[in-house]
Amino acid sequence: MQAKSARKKVRSLRIIIVGCGKVGHTLTEQLVREGHDITIVDTSERVVRDTTEMFDVMGIRGNGASLNVLMEAGLQEADLVIAVTGSDELNLLCCLMAKKNAKCHTIARVRNPLYNKEIRFIREQLGISMIINPELTTAREILKVLKFPSAIKIDTFAKGRVELLHFRIKPEMGFDGKTIMELMGRLK
C-alpha cells in the first residue's frame, strides 16, 4: 500500500496570458512553475518565439482582442484569461471577448487613473472577474504603511471597510495574554 501524499494536488489550470511584456513574462514563469498549462498571446513574433522556447508553453502571435486569435489559443478550454498588454482598452476588450465566448474567468490590468472610479461599473457591466490597477494597489499599500507605521502586517476585509492590524507587543506593555475585553477595559 502506498502512503498518500500529505499535500493535496492542485488541479492544473488552462490559462491564456495576453501580453508578454515584463508582467506577462513573470506571470508565465510563475504559473509554469506551479504546473499550469499556459498559452501566451503577443503581437511580437520574437517575444512569442523567445517565451515559448524559454518556458515550453504554447504561443500565438496576434491581437488578443481578436476572437479568432483567442480561439486559436484555446479559449473554449481555458479556465482563465489574463490580459496584461500595455493598453487598458485592449485588456478590457480581450477580457470581454473571452467572457462572452467562453466559460472562463478573466483578469484585466487597467492602469489609467481615469478608470479608477469606474472599475466596479466596468467589472460588473462587462462581466470581468477582476480588474487590477498595480499603481493604485501600490499607492494604497504605501498609505497603509504611513497610516500605521508600527504595524507589522495589515489585512483588509469587507472591500476596505475593515482593517486587521498585526503589532509586535513587548512584555512591558502589559497586553500579552489579555483578552480583548480586558484590553477594552484598560482603554476606557
How would you label these PLM feature ranges?
Residues 1-188:
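Cytosolic regulatory regions of ion transport systems
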